Amino acid sequence: MCIPENMWTPPTLPLPLQSFPKENIPIDKRTQKCLLQIKKLCSTQFSLNKEYKSTFNLIDYKLQRIIQPHNLSVNPINSFWPHTVERLVVPPIYYEMLSNQQIYTLDYLQINPQYHIPIKSVQKSKQKAFQLNLLPLPRQKFRQIQLESYMPSKLESKMTSICEESLPKTVIFDYHGYFDLKQKLLTSNTLLTARLNPISTSAGCRQKLKFTTHWPSWTIEINTDISNISRLHKVLFDENFNKIELFKLASCNLKVERSTRIKKNHIATWKLDKLQLKELDWDPLKKLKAYSVQKKINCDEVHAQATFIITPLKLVLMPINSSEIHILQNNYGNIVISAKSFGNLQPKNTIESSQVSNNNTKLLKEARTTGSSMSDRSTSITSYKCSSLVPEKRSLLDSNLISIVQLKKLRTSYPQSTESHSGEMSLLRLLHSNSCKTEIQQIDTWYDTAKLNTTPKTTSFKLEGQDIKKKVSIIANEYDISTTYQITRLLRERQYSNIEEYRIKLPCHFILSFSSCLLLVEISKVFQCITAGELFLERTLSILIKHFRVVHVFIEYEPNTELYDKDIFWKAKLILNNPQVRTIFIPKFSNNLTTWMLRVTTIQGQKFQEMVKDNTLSHFNINPYQEYLIQEKLRESSPSRLIETLVFGDHVLDGILTPIHINSLKIFARENWHLT
């Protein structure tokens, strides 16, 4: 058999190798698998190109590039490579020889230097053989256990659906219309890099991410019961808060129509400390005073100073209750505006009826002596001087004018009845008349009849030494025995013994009437907190407001408080800003509280023991004053009968009881009451 010249002939092995005797060698399973794989490799067909020469170094470089396999996952046992240009097959003549001596041929190729294969190590020679398709690529198999999951976990299914998350750049708060503030977007550059990385559940799985511009917004539910107190509490403990912010006016942004677009100027709020305000030279009219207008008339320069008219602002004051006039009026010297502090609660004595009567007699005597002079109207206007314009008497009016004004007030205080209308005499007719005797008699008769018929509408009172003729009762609650005992002792020292002690489950010291109570607190306890964010008086006042229409809170302070802390008064007033709460400041160890209680507490001119006979309604936190009014309202029925009327929707007691009392009585009547 002749071999063609252009075909490659493998070298023959030496004969001594074939003469070796056969032996049975024990082989483990691992070597058996290796031998089986070698047998399969020996069965593969070597594919060589017809254009190849007898040596490897004569192969064209372009053909080598074509034959080189790509990195594809192909079964190395299979001899067919789909990426090659053509399949090179060895003729069947040399197939038997190659199948028997393939391993020795590869070893010979690695050692023989005539093929110009640079061999440095066995590992590099194997890599070169793999590149020339002489050896297939090895593949390692691993045992994989595939179990069917009958109950797939929810966590794994959710992990596959997790998208990339990012923190929002804006924070928007929705107050549901409680604040008329414009929402302003707050951008921050620090949040751009703070992005969460995606969680890779599988190696080859990628999810498409979609970013939207709709940023989330959070809603805040505001509790309407304590919203006012909690808001004032936050303002009170703000270190940067200043009183000037209470008087700031909201400025509106005007739209300007222009052809070119301009940037919007965001109006920001400003805050200044007290030290910065003192350092500022607050004189806005300083530049306006030095302003001058320059005009040219007949080629002459005339400098005329410009005048500016500044209209004062109109102040709208809130209405003040009549019970607080004696505390808030500046005439009594309670509030010192220059020092910004509160004074003593003790008011000065007002003009009494005795002083008015003395002024009346003086006026009548002067009218007798100067009657003829007043009838003569030939006096000139220039002979009189206005007392209010005299620099020595700017503070008060003339004494004669005061007496005339007081007489006018007394006359208007009495109602005009038909019987005394004929005897009335005006003050101007008295001054301009000649017959003074008859006029004096008419005035005396009118004054006496008015005293007998009616009483004046507004009478002056005097707190010190007031004679209490009515049998008025005051209820002392055993809420704080030490405090109530001190006040009751002061009341009894002033010869007031109508004090009744009761144990009512309400946090107040005294009950003054059916709709008002009294609470005495030290100024240091106003700013104390029971828990985080809850004040000491917040829970107490929320209970008293439900059971009473008016709550009088007396705050005791030491006299030295005005020196070292002046702002504590308006802070306490601000935190107790409620229409049902009346805040009054009194100094410690003073009789102002007892004087105020004696003036305010009045009830029907009867003793407390006589008017209250049944304490059935006290279980519903109804005070004895309300029980008395209920008995007066429904004399024919008993308190048990009153509960029956509530079942049928009777609204007779709406003006006496609060809504919480009526609801508690209705619940009791519907659940535990059986009609007979």
Curated annotation (Swiss-Prot):
Gene Ontology cellular component annotations, sorted alphabetically: chromosome; nucleus
Per UniProt, subcellular location reads as: Nucleus; Chromosome
Q: Say yes or no: keyword tRNA-binding present.
A: no
Any idea which GO molecular function terms this record carries? DNA binding; nucleotide binding
Q: Which domain of life is it from?
A: Eukaryota
Keywords for the protein's UniProt record, in alphabetical order: Cell cycle, Chromosomal rearrangement, Chromosome, Chromosome partition, DNA-binding, Meiosis, Nucleotide-binding, Nucleus
> Which BP terms from GO are recorded?
chromosome segregation; meiotic cell cycle
Q: What does this protein do?
A: Required for initiation of meiotic chromosome synapsis. Involved in synaptonemal complex formation, a structure that tethers a pair of homologous chromosomes along their lengths and plays a central role in recombination and homolog segregation during meiosis.
The family classification in the record reads: Belongs to the ZIP2 family.
| Name of protein | Protein ZIP2
